[in-house]
Amino acid sequence: IQERYANRLDVKGQDFLRRIVRATQRLDQLLTDILDLSRAQRMDPPVDDIDAEQLVHEVLRRLEKRIKETDARITIRSPLPRLRVNTTWAIQGIYNLVANALKFASAGQAPDIEIAPHSGMDLEGNELIGLVVRDRGPGVAPEQRDRIFELFRRAVGREIEGTGAGLAIVRQVAERHSGRAWVEPREGGGSEFFITFGVNQSSPRKVQR
């Protein structure tokens, strides 16, 4: 419709048509994200033993156009760990974190992103290993640091287009691998987004909320 009729419309009509196209694109992305979240809840057991650096480079390959458009600086703090994961979903989780960092850069500044290894323990003493994605964006207020991982929830004041499902998918991916996903403030400004996976796991964990 846009290609066929755009030249026949006045300025007001063309603006209205552009709004329809943008709304359709947002709806399409929303449906895609909902399907991704549903699939993540039913993902296959983590059967792949893989170097996290391979996952990160695949994510950066997929985001290459956006990285160039934003003139982003990406730093990888090697060595990154080996992970036992479902590769498809681990890539999706890391992709969403890096895409989020690209999207929420501070106004007027090129994104400055660092990807580094992270290890720790959960509350039950189980070993976790994964990645942290650091940015120099506006940060996340303390009261919003958990809610942004809920479906369709976004930080108040972040007036940037999106479906509000990306971080919910990250959390689902982490938890289905007996891990965690969370955010902390970064020293000097910005945020640190973590995605971790259980070291000793044989199948995804079903998380009850």
Model feature map: region roles:
Residues K65, P138-G139:
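Glycine-rich G1-box
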Residues R22-L27:
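Short alpha-helical segment of the dimerization/phosphotransfer core of two-component systems
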Residues A101-A105:
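Short helix-loop "hinge" at the ATP-lid/N-box region of the Bergerat-fold HATPase_c
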Residues G166, V170:
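Short alpha-helical Gxxx[C/S/T] motif in the catalytic ATP-binding
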Residues P46-R61, E114:
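A conserved beta-strand-to-alpha-helix junction within the catalytic ATP-binding
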Residues V140-F152:
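Short conserved segment of the HATPase_c
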Residues S178-E184:
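Glycine-rich ATP-binding loops of the HATPase_c
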